[in-house]
Amino acid sequence: MSYIDGFLIAVPVAQRDAFIQHAGTFDAIILEYGAVRVMECWADDVPHGKLTDFHRAVQARDDEAVVFSWIEWPDKATRDSGM
């Protein structure tokens, strides 16, 4: 069964290109350690909720976007040795 590490972060909108470049470097490294897939998803239609939402979860400022990413590993043992 696959094992997933998930991440939710706030990234300054003005730093999007730098984030993408950094994420690409990280992705290549983590794949060498056994990850099957790495995804970064830049939010473009994430509404603000009434009680809670992704924006509040990361305390995103008005100039920041929410990024949801995950690493898929073949199993927990590979993840533990890769991290």
Residue ranges and their predicted role:
Residues 1-83:
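Short S/T/G/P-rich N-terminal loop/turn motif that feeds into the first structured element of a domain
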